[in-house]
Amino acid sequence: EIRVWTFNRSGDDSRQDAMAEEIMSLADVFDYKVTQGAKFFGWKFNPDSKMRELHTKLMKEVFDIDLKMEATHGGLETGVFFGKEPEMDIICFGPKGSGAHTPEEYLDLESFKEMFDYLCKFLAALTKE
């Protein structure tokens, strides 16, 4: 018996759905059974994000970092919230790490502490907005 597990992710739900359809079509060609499980909702870049503006400003103040914005597949778990509340303003940030989803995956604990402290400052600043 061969089992293949995939977790399709995309910032665009239609692309994620298209990939799932391709996988199901390919499986059908070989008469494989396909079971669809949980779906991670995507969320697209919001050019008018007030939360991102605050985050950018606070990262500069706290860490003297000029943020570089980039889209990745990481952090899409927050899309679960976006799937339920599409008008929600969402950002993702986190500690340093490497080797995601591999046996070599690790988390930099000092960076984790810094990000936890930063999160507390960010939430405090958010309540003043």
Locations of regions flagged by a protein language model:
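Hydrophobic alpha-helix feature that most strongly marks membrane-spanning transmembrane helices
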Residues: 28, 60, 83-86, 124-127
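Zn-dependent metallopeptidase/amidohydrolase metal-coordination segment
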Residues: 66-122
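N-terminal/domain-start segments enriched in small and hydrophobic, helix-friendly residues
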Residues: 15, 19, 40-71, 112-118, ...
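C-terminal domain-closing interface element
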Residues: 5, 9, 16, 123-129
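A short beta-alpha structural unit
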Residues: 4-12, 32-52, 73, 77-79
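Short amphipathic alpha-helices in soluble, non-transmembrane regions
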Residues: 18-27
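Flexible, glycine/charged-enriched surface loops at secondary-structure junctions
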Residues: 29-37, 65-70, 128-129
